[in-house]
Amino acid sequence: MLKLFSAFRKNKIWDFNGGIHPPEMKTQSNGTPLRQVPLAQRFVIPLKQHIGAEGELCVSVGDKVLRGQPLTRGRGKMLPVHAPTSGTVTAIAPHSTAHPSALAELSVIIDADGEDCWIPRDGWADYRSRRREELIERIHQFGVAGLGGAGFPTGVKLQGGGDKIETLIINAAECEPYITADDRLMQDCAAQVVEGIRILAHILQPREILIGIEDNKPQAISMLRAVLADSHDISMRVIPTKYPSGGAKQLTYILTGKQVPHGGRSSDIGVLMQNVGTAYAVKRAVIDGEPITERVVTLTGEAIARPGNVWARLGTPVRHLLNDAGFCPSADQMVIMGGPLMGFTLPWLDVPVVKITNCLLAPSANELGEPQEEQSCIRCSACADACPADLLPQQLYWFSKGQQHDKATTHNIADCIECGACAWVCPSNIPLVQYFRQEKAEIAAIRQEEKRAAEAKARFEARLARLEREKAARLERHKSAAVQPAAKDKDAIAAALARVKEKQAQATQPIVIKAGERPDNSAIIAAREARKAQARAKQAELQQTNDAATVTDPRKTAVEAAIARAKARKLEQQQANAEPEQQVDPRKAAVEAAIARAKARKLEQQQANAEPEQQVDPRKAAVEAAIARAKARKLEQQQANAEPEEPVDPRKAAVEAAITRAKARKLEQQQANAEPEEQVDPRKAAVAAAIARAKARKLEQQQANAEPEEQVDPRKAAVAAAIARVQAKKAVQQKVVNED
């Protein structure tokens, strides 16, 4: 008896509220076996054919590709796509895709070469020896996604289930009218489907495995039973035909009696569901080593001459499939991708087949009937009775039209599975599903904007916090920098204060003068002299700085010196001519001549010291020196002629001659030292030196002949001349040492 009750409970099924029974229209396409379609000339492969972000491109225009070669890399939830055939990548550009609005998405366009060559395939026949993580990664990298219509990456779904999955459900209900892709796949490939189910079971290790299939598929049921005859780990449950019993939440409740909580997932109650087509794709990926490059697509409708189910390559244009099936379009012909309740009308036929394409319906005008005009809601509640999710479609309709997003969210619009049962039974012909889709899209956009605002607010608050931290750290640094001075600084400050106090005490000390004593002002006098000396030193430094800063031309300086000497001689001549009878003191004249010569020498010295680095032409300098000596001798002769009666001291004359010779030698030395690098003609230098010596001797002779009548002791004159020469040489040497 207990076994009977256990068996009864084991095979028990539950029924959900709502649902409808539309015409099935499945016999048009489920009677013929699966067949291949000739390759198209061009394939368009969108990078995003699943829920999640598109993968990273790994091919470029002009690349040769083989069938099964990855076109993108799959990282995280990004699912890769693969080449459906061999050929050449001709473009990577946006292209209209399978979407109600025909949105353009980035796609890889391949021109087929007709050879249809595969990449090297490496199958894992002994998949049981592989680790769970390896199998999940292989399924993910081979591009397997949910082929029942959702398109969720299978590898991510298996990874998220983890160890908490107790029941694995294989969805074979296929409840929507016209669609027979899963039915035909189970009839023709039942063994491969079961093998895929075993791979999923090996990964998840569930406690039970259930196959849910509607009772309107007798051939598929018989094929599965034949394959599962010797299996005791997989149970097949045949359920009554009712739309939408193929929904994930509805089928879960039918087979287990468990309800998925609002806003939750089936994994929350220990259930994971996979489609029949997904199980077949898992088998091909793991055992055969073939990425998903094709899927079964139902071609049906009265506008198609040869309806049936075909193996359609992903990326094949819809027009190519329809033309191969004998498509006979009428005026205003529509083509629906998907079923009549959950599908959408294609804006044109150049869109490609993708992973979630399970049916192409081309109905005639008789099948669809005349279009009905939308009318006002009469609140009949027929939609609420038909809703399989236990929602209130009429309330959601009003909230959607009134943009009352909060109320729509409160009434669980997110739980709507968009099955279309409410719109099917609506007597006012209101396209309720369209309103619900639009409302859910608007709510998603609002939440996305709120998320961005929250992230921006978080960034702003983080920035404010960072600025506050930086400000606090800056203030702390200022406080630490404003601490008391160090010990040595304190000592220096104390010493300065002591000196100031001492000076103030000395300044305020009264001066006491005792009777009979003179005040001692020596300190004051010494301080005054020190200040004067300091002022003179500063003045001298300033004068030296100004002299050093003044850059003059040596030739101009020589000219100025010559002009000064000429003016001195002219003044002496004027004085001599103006008063010939006037007795001139010879000593004063000699003093004035000496002063003039001293000024000339000083000017020459300043010229030599002003620019020692300046490059001077030695020949020009020699000429100027000779001119200066000649002018000096001429001035002496004029002085001698102006006062013939004046007796001349021979010793003075000898001294002057020696000084003149010394000047000549010094000038020659300065010229030689000024440019040691300059190449000078030795013959010219010797000639110039000889001329200078000859002029000096001539001057001595003139001085000697000026007063022949004067009796001069020759011995005294010789001694005086020798002494003068020695003194002149000594003076020149001392001057050279000082200048060095």
From Swiss-Prot:
Q: List cellular component terms (GO).
A: plasma membrane
Which cofactors are named for this entry?
[4Fe-4S] cluster
Q: Domain 4Fe-4S ferredoxin-type, which positions?
A: 369-397, 407-436
What the entry lists under InterPro entries is as follows: 4Fe4S_Fe-S-bd, 4Fe4S_Fe_S_CS, Ion_transpt_RnfC/RsxC, Nuo51_FMN-bd, Nuo51_FMN-bd_sf, RnfC_N, Soluble_ligand-bd
Give the compositionally biased regions (Low complexity).
Answer: 605-615
**Keywords per UniProt:** 4Fe-4S, Cell inner membrane, Cell membrane, Electron transport, Iron, Iron-sulfur, Membrane, Metal-binding, Repeat, Translocase, Transport
- Quote the record's binding site residues for [4Fe-4S] cluster 1: 377, 380, 383, 426
The protein's location, in the record's own words, is: Cell inner membrane
Give the EC number: 7.-.-.-
Q: How is the cofactor bound?
A: Binds 2 [4Fe-4S] clusters per subunit.
The cross-references to PANTHER family, in alphabetical order and at most eight, read: ION-TRANSLOCATING OXIDOREDUCTASE COMPLEX SUBUNIT C
From the Swiss-Prot or TrEMBL record, give the protein name: Ion-translocating oxidoreductase complex subunit C
**Native species:** Escherichia coli O157:H7
